[in-house]
Amino acid sequence: VINFPDKTNHQIFLELESADSEEVYVNGLTTAMPPFAQEAMMRTIAGLENARVMRYGYAVEYDYAPASQLYPSLESKKIEGLFFAGQINGTSGYEEAACQGFIAGVNAARKVDNKEPVIIDRSEGYIGVLIDDIIHKKTPEPYRVLPSRSEYRLTLRFDNAFMRLFKKAKEIGILSKERIDYLEKAIETVNSCLL
């Protein structure tokens, strides 16, 4: 089996499943093949010629919709009222899926209420960077959020998120009255120290 014909070798890592297990995970070995092919490949690895497979790997494949067909609200440009989030947008990862689901859900609810969508700018948060990148840039592999993708990475910090996103969080309605009061006082305190 030749998965990448231009490569003559491939690095793998043998990782113990846990301290209490004798199972080893062969990280880097492709599992998008039937069991007989997985065994044959494993037997070519020095030291694993007689290894026993505990569970065969499997492949998961996903379809995706080109994110360039979405508005920054994650609503489809082709079908009004249809919002997309997660892997179907060409992203990978729990955080990426969660933040898109949040934005798509908020904007779907706002659409029903005839309210303007909530758009997070690149300068306001990594959610904004992710959405802007997937709808405006071609990404060759599933997209992951990385600080290096943001030109605002020095200002997109956890310690100032409440100042950057407070107004939108308040507008969306995800903050309790107590939290709003607390954050307004915190913002006032920070601003008074900056003057």
Tell what function each PLM region has.
Residues 70, 88-96, 118-121, 153-157:
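Alpha-helix capping and helix-loop boundary segments enriched in small/acidic/polar residues
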Residues 45-46, 50, 103-111:
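Glycine-rich loop(s) and the adjacent beta-strand/alpha-helix scaffold that form part
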Residues 15-17, 95-96, 141:
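Acidic-residue sensor for enzyme active/binding pockets
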Residues 102, 108, 114-195:
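Non-catalytic terminal regions with compositionally biased, polar/charged low complexity
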